[in-house]
Amino acid sequence: SLTGRKSVAHFNDWCLSVDEPVGQHFRKVMTGQAASLATGIQATAAIVPGHYASEEQVARALARLGKPAAAALIQGKLPTTKAIRSGDLGEIYATEWIDAHSGGYRAPIKRLRWKDHRNMAMRGDDVIGILQDAQTQRLQFLKTEAKSRATLTAQVLTEARAGLDKDGGLPSAHALSFISARLLDLDNLPLADAIDDALLKHAI
């Protein structure tokens, strides 16, 4: 099942959010405010560690080896290059936004925990949000493309649109299989089964 968790990114405390109509839809532009920079930094610092290591992993290191070792565990997973740090942060913000502001969708895993190397970008769909129908147990998917740039230009939007259009606009089979496998590792069998059904039975 999908169990929501309260986001601690607190975007509304440090970002200005503006909705702009686009045909029958709208786009939401969120901009960090300079006057609230300290709040944004504090909120971000609180969420970043959990995207690279599970709470259980950190707690175990803390209990067995103490604070310096637990800190070293997280430090060893954080990217050291500016480009990868920026890209990872885009995925982290996207995940947190989905959980808090997407109208019921949830990102069921924090996929940065499974990076091959801290200074390598992960391949595949950036973030997949999932909404499960309480009656039918069928899933709806929110495919996400996270871009990290200094300025939101038309070119950035074009690149993001191209990423979203891959696989016919649907989540890739690889991305869904990856999520399903990780959910099995986490003993979330019902959601893993529902994803496998969507992929193999319903052919989304």
Model-predicted segments: where are they?
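Nuclease-adjacent, charged terminal/linker segments that flank catalytic cores
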Residues: 1-66, 72-81
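A short, highly charged nucleic-acid-interacting micro-segment common to nuclease
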Residues: 74-95, 112-117
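Buried hydrophobic packing segments
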Residues: 94-102
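Conserved catalytic cores of phosphodiester-cleaving nucleases, focusing on short active-site segments
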Residues: 98, 127-129, 142-148
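A short acidic/basic microdomain associated with nuclease active sites
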Residues: 101-120
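Charged, often glycine-rich, active-site loop that binds/positions anionic groups
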Residues: 117-129
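Short, solvent-exposed loop/turn segments that connect beta-strands within catalytic domains
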Residues: 133-139
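Acidic, metal/cofactor-coordinating or nucleic-acid-engaging core segments within structured domains
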Residues: 152-204
